[in-house]
UniProtKB/Swiss-Prot annotation:
Residue spans crossing the bilayer: none
Name listed for the protein in its UniProt record: UPF0398 protein lin2003
Source organism (scientific name): Listeria innocua serovar 6a (strain ATCC BAA-680 / CLIP 11262)
Lineage, uppermost ranks: Bacteria, Bacillati, Bacillota, Bacilli, Bacillales
Family statement drawn from the similarity comment of this UniProt entry: Belongs to the UPF0398 family.
Database matches in NCBIfam families: PRK13660.1
């Protein structure tokens, strides 16, 4: 597997409103623990669309992993000016991650017009990656459901790699990181 998409909940879907909230430490560690074995098995590219939350945290993780591993980050935004209506802190966060990317492009080369651009993003990313890592719990639906449904279909039809990190996996990392010896 050479390329993988990483996506999941937006931060506010998880009740997290700051990029550096305590919970983000655990989320980023969980993503890191799932990416490292894939990188060691030959993963070359991590693809995100630059959404707030899981995707930008994944971008931060990949930026750090690039110091030790031969991994690259691509940010494929669904449309131009995706972050235009975000607050200043979130815009800066997105710019930091895009600045660390090895590749940045827009799937549709125009500003937001309709939800169809999100569907186009999902289809394009699934069609151009070998798999996906989702921070998504089937027991708590949210915005990742649309990507999950398409990726699940790709898995069934075309042997697409699909791994979901659920809340139990996140809790395992929290407990592991907080263990005292």
């Amino acid at each position: 597997m050479k390329s993988i998409a990483v996506t999941g909940y937006k931060n506010f879907e998880l009740g997290i409103f700051k990029k550096d909230a305590d919970e983000a430490v655990y989320i980023k560690e969980t993503i890191k623990r799932h990416l490292i074995p894939l990188i060691e098995d030959g993963l070359e590219w991590v693809i995100i669309s630059g959404q707030l939350g899981i995707e930008l945290w994944a971008g931060e993780v990949v930026a750090l992993l690039k110091e030790e591993y031969p991994i690259k980050l691509a940010v494929l935004e669904p449309f131009e000016k995706q972050s235009a209506n975000w607050n200043e802190n979130n815009q800066l966060w997105a710019q930091e991650v895009i600045g660390a990317a090895d590749y940045h492009a827009f799937i549709t080369k125009r500003p937001y017009e309709s939800p169809a651009q999100f569907a186009a993003r999902d289809g394009f990313i699934i069609d151009n990656t070998d798999g996906a890592l989702l921070v998504y719990d089937l027991e708590k639906e949210g915005s990742p459901k649309f990507f999950y449904d398409r990726a699940k279909l790709a898995k069934e039809q075309a042997n697409y790699f699909l791994e979901c990190i659920d809340f139990y996996a996140l809790q395992d990392v929290v407990e592991d990181m907080n263990q005292t010896f």
